[in-house]
Amino acid sequence: MKLKKIGISLRVEKIEKFNEKRDTISHDWINFLQKLDYFPVLIPNNLTDVEDYISELKLNGIILSGGDNIGEFPERDQTENKILEYAIKNSIPVLGVCRGMQLINTFFNGTISENSNSGHVGKPHNIDIMNPSLVNLFGHDKLEVNSFHNNLIKKDDIGDELDVFALSEKDFTIEGCFHKKYPIIGVMWHPERDQQKKHQSQIIDIFYNKKIW
C-alpha cells in the first residue's frame, strides 16, 4: 500500500533550563493523521537545505502547524517560507493551521493585525463559510470551531491572490482562505484539537486531495 505522506512543520521552544532550542509537535497531530491513515513526517527548522530534504521525502502534502508568533524564531519563518516555495514549484498541497495560515498570508504579501484583545483564545465560536464549493464539501454554511489565536487577519490584511472562504461570526475576521491558483489553504482553528468533529477530517481531505483547485 502506498503511504500517504504528510510533512508537518514544527514549532520552536526555547528551553531555558538547558539553554537550547527544540523543535516540537503536539501528539494530537500525530494521533489525528494516523487515525485518518496518513503517514506524518516531521520537518525540522535547522536544515541546511530544506528543498533537498523535502525532495527526498517524496511528500504528498504539507501542514504548516501552529504555535509561535511570526518573527519570534526566524529559523522557523525561513524554513516555512522555503517549504511554501518548494510546494508551489512542485504542486504539493499545503494546509496552514493558525500561525500556518498567518505565514501563508504574509508569504503572499498580506499582513497580520497583532496583539489584539480579540477574545479568540480558548473560546469556541461559529464561522460562516462563504465559498459555495466549500459549503457543499462541508455540508454546512456554518461551523463551530475552536480558537487559540491572539493575532488576527482582517479583510484589509489579506494577501495577493488569496480568496477568503470563512469569517468569524462574532467579529468578521478571517478564519479561512485559499490561493486562487495553487493548492494552498489556511484555517485559523486547530483541526487536531477537536478530532471528533467531522469538519476537522474534512479539511484534511479537502487540502490533501486538492478538492477546490
For each predicted feature, which ranges?
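DNA-recognition element of transcription regulators
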Residues: 147-148
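His/Met- and acidic-residue-enriched segments that coordinate or traffic transition-metal cofactors
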Residues: 174
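Active-site-proximal beta-strand elements of phosphoester/diester hydrolases
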Residues: 185-189
